[in-house]
Amino acid sequence: KGSFYHYYSGKDELLASLPEIFDAKYEEVMQALDPEMDSFDKLMTLCFSVHDLIESDIPVGLLASLYSSQVVTKGDKHLLNQNRFYYKMVNQLVDEGQRRGQITRSMPYYEIAHMYALCERAIIYDYCISDGGYALGEYTRKTMPLLFGGVRVKQEVK
C-alpha cells in the first residue's frame, strides 16, 4: 500500500475523501477572493487553484480511480453529489455573474453551472487518460477560458 492509504481503511474510503479535499481547497480560495472580483474570473481562479492542488498533491492513478469509480458505480457518486460545497459555489457564482452582467443570461444559471463542471471534468479526464503527462495547472490556464469563455459577456471598454 502507498503512503496515501496509511490514513484510510481502504481505497473506497480514500476515493470518497477526494471530493472533500477538493471542496476544502475551493472554500479556502473562495474566502480569499475579493468579493468585487469579476464572477467569471472567480470561477477561473477557483478552477486553476484546485487543478494546481491536484497536479502537486494527488497521484494521477488515484484521480483516475476516482473518475472510473464514478462511471461504473451504482452506489455513491461522491464527485457528482449536488450537496457538495463545489456545486453550491459554482451555482452561486454563475448566478452572481448573471446578475452583474458578466455571464450570459441566455440560459438558466444552473445550466451554465453544469457546463462549467463539465469543462472542469473534461480537463481532469484528459489529464487522467494522458497519465498525467503534462502540467495540469498550466494546461487548465490555457484550456478552461477557451472551453467556458462563451458564457462570458464582453465588457465595454471604458
Place the predicted regions along the sequence by residue.
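Helix-turn-helix
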Residues: 1-13, 17
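Amphipathic, non-transmembrane alpha-helical scaffold segments
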Residues: 15, 19, 23, 76-87, ...
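Hydrophobic alpha-helical connector segments
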Residues: 17, 21, 31-57, 109-116, ...
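C-terminal peripheral helix-coil segments that are non-catalytic and often amphipathic
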Residues: 44-45, 49-53, 88, 92-100, ...
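Short secondary-structure transition hinges
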Residues: 52-91, 102
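Short beta-strand "wing" residues that participate in macromolecule-binding interfaces
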Residues: 105
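Structural signal for membrane-spanning alpha-helices in multi-pass inner-membrane proteins
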Residues: 122-126
